[in-house]
């Protein structure tokens, strides 16, 4: 048996044709940088010419492979070293964001350059988002002016939909937050974003990436209060953002109070303990009595399995609400709170069809228990009711309202006789 390896035949004198897709010239980052910078310098700061140059160069240069280098140059003028400084011994260009005028109009023009480039080469979208995330982490390595320009540009790009609001995650970096860089950067960013759109559009974008409740995290833990956030951004000229965050915090607090109240009621905790908890939360979150009475009503009504039979549910409701009347009375010390409760009862009885005949009996119970008084009931009947089930509930209340009016007249008559 021959153990020697059989020599494979060779093809001599053959020339293989390179595949077309492999013919594209391969550049290393330095060569790529040289080509881009040379082309940018030749445009002479004409951003229309810059956009055309970038459009044409994508057919010759490997944008996909060197996206980071490309965006480094367009923002900072050259390749960035870790930390945000320009890499040593590299050539640079002044045709970039950091060398441009620090004003909104100039940044809007640069935003158009990025917009055209990414629309032309869609595959750059992901690389561009990664670049912006990186740049935000490098903020400490940039000058104040460079940060301001980047903030304005980012705000415009967010408004135009060129970036997802998820890039803002980089601003929650511990060191950036601790040194106040994140909060200051966010001022310029949100100003330009709101200038392009409005606070509702901004809120919608933040909500999509679950950041609508995280804005206070731009500050260190010891400053993460509504008061501090509101003052900081109001003083910076962003009152609408401050109000938005205040409202978000209030909404969050309402949900927490509602959840806790349901649990306390289900556990059968004493009214005094529930009252103390609610009053503490009102003070802590600056929540009005009118808001709290609605939450309290909803919590009390949601912790019961109601009878499906209309003739039985009223009796069940009266029995349940009777024991909670003293608790409700503690949070109807103002006429507006009483009116709010009346509207909540009206809406509840309309939305839950088995309660349609219960409305008047609930109101009478609360009147006798001093949860509701004459004036708000009469006001509700006259013109403060809502459209839901209006005709049914007004008819139910007709006799009781007449009785209230007569009682009021008799009281006034007795007062006059006494005088």
UniProtKB/Swiss-Prot annotation:
Swiss-Prot/TrEMBL GO biological process terms: regulation of translational initiation
GO CC aspect terms: cytoplasm; membrane
Region of interest called Disordered, as start-end residue ranges on this chain: 1-26
Domain (W2) ranges: 247-414
Source organism superkingdom: Eukaryota
SUPFAM superfamilies, alphabetized: ARM repeat
Segments of skewed composition (Polar residues): 1-15
Main function: Translation initiation regulator which may repress repeat-associated non-AUG (RAN) initiated translation probably by acting as a competitive inhibitor of eukaryotic translation initiation factor 5 (EIF5) function. Enhances histone H4 gene transcription but does not seem to bind DNA directly.
Protein name per the record: eIF5-mimic protein 2
Organism lineage: Eukaryota, Metazoa, Chordata, Craniata, Vertebrata
